[in-house]
Amino acid sequence: MENNELLDITLRPKSLKEFIGQKKIKDNIEVFIKAALIRQEPLDHVLFCGPPGLGKTTLATVIANELGVNIKSTSGPVLERAGDVAAILTNLSDRDILFIDEIHRLPRMVEEILYPAMEDFTLDIIVGQGPSARSIKINLPRFTLIGATTRTGLITSPLRDRFGVVFRLEFYNSEELKEIVKRSARILGILIEENAATEIARRSRGTPRVANRLLKRIRDFAQVKDKDIIDLQIAQEALIAMDVDDYGLDDMDRKILLTIIEKFNGGPAGIESIAASLREDKDTIEDVYEPYLMQEGFIERTARGRVATRFAYEVLKRKIPERLF
């Protein structure tokens, strides 16, 4: 496992008490967990939706810790055949958790295997071929499926309807991110000034994963410059060096906005056209960059495509077209 991955795991909260932000979701999860423990039943199936880096995987692990059960983690693209799911499900114990990241990318055949597993805790397996083929029903342990997706609209209705609990994670505010930065700094053994933590939080795109990534890189700058503490000056210098501006926009964010403004006259522009112009994957733009740009009012999605807002023109110091006056 890479050092960065080990660091990321170290920084992840292990309990609901340690988890910062998403208060309403946390409060509901706490109730559902307590009820499941009182009844000695598995937690109902849970679906987490929202942009990358907001804590979907972390919350799945936290739930397992709070319930005192094992968690088996996998992802939609990895589960190519029905047998892949069957092998995992039959090796779970009662009340264990199966976590499927990118659940919207499950092949249809695999998804259909999950229907009876989620509803009745059974698997219907076809044995043999041709006229001699027969169906065998296998009883499964009473497990909890936790799914995570950045693309709720791509999940089929039959699968979505089988989740008893659906949560949409929202971007974090600056105060929550500042607390996350300070907590991560303590774990990493870094001294950081209050205003430096505020600055990092302000430029973290509302996303804990980004906040932690920026903190680790700013630590590099501080150590190379022989600084014992991250102060506001070193934080700002490092953020400028990494092309992260006052609004949290990075180089790719600006390229997306400038493409809409300069190549498509401010839009509307189709996502495929934008992706082709940037030579970037369409899904990456939609999943990673677009949610924040929309949240902060840089672009709007219309039936005809993406449109750059007046705010985008102002921030990028481009001449504002008459239609936006």
Curated annotation (Swiss-Prot):
One of its GO terms (cellular component) is cytoplasm. It is found in: Cytoplasm. Its EC number is 3.6.4.-. Keywords: ATP-binding, Cytoplasm, DNA damage, DNA recombination, DNA repair, DNA-binding, Hydrolase, Nucleotide-binding. One of its GO terms (biological process) is DNA repair. Gene3D superfamilies: 1.10.8.60, P-loop containing nucleotide triphosphate hydrolases (3.40.50.300), Winged helix-like DNA-binding domain superfamily/Winged helix DNA-binding domain (1.10.10.10). It catalyses: ATP + H2O = ADP + phosphate + H(+). Residues 246-325 are annotated as: Head domain (RuvB-H). Pfam families: AAA_lid_4, RuvB_C, RuvB_N. It is an enzyme of class 3 (hydrolase). Residues 1-172 are annotated as: Large ATPase domain (RuvB-L). The keyword DNA-binding applies. Mg(2+) binds at T57. Residues 173-243 are annotated as: Small ATPAse domain (RuvB-S). Its main location: cytoplasm. ATP binds at L11, R12, G53, K56, T57, T58, E119, D120, F121, R162, Y172, R209. The keyword DNA damage applies. Has 3 domains, the large (RuvB-L) and small ATPase (RuvB-S) domains and the C-terminal head (RuvB-H) domain. The head domain binds DNA, while the ATPase domains jointly bind ATP, ADP or are empty depending on the state of the subunit in the translocation cycle. During a single DNA translocation step the structure of each domain remains the same, but their relative positions change. The RuvA-RuvB-RuvC complex processes Holliday junction (HJ) DNA during genetic recombination and DNA repair, while the RuvA-RuvB complex plays an important role in the rescue of blocked DNA replication forks via replication fork reversal (RFR). RuvA specifically binds to HJ cruciform DNA, conferring on it an open structure. The RuvB hexamer acts as an ATP-dependent pump, pulling dsDNA into and through the RuvAB complex. RuvB forms 2 homohexamers on either side of HJ DNA bound by 1 or 2 RuvA tetramers; 4 subunits per hexamer contact DNA at a time. Homohexamer. Forms an RuvA(8)-RuvB(12)-Holliday junction (HJ) complex. HJ DNA is sandwiched between 2 RuvA tetramers; dsDNA enters through RuvA and exits via RuvB. An RuvB hexamer assembles on each DNA strand where it exits the tetramer. Each RuvB hexamer is contacted by two RuvA subunits (via domain III) on 2 adjacent RuvB subunits; this complex drives branch migration. In the full resolvosome a probable DNA-RuvA(4)-RuvB(12)-RuvC(2) complex forms which resolves the HJ. Belongs to the RuvB family. This is Holliday junction branch migration complex subunit RuvB. The lineage of its organism: Bacteria, Pseudomonadati, Nitrospirota, Thermodesulfovibrionia, Thermodesulfovibrionales.
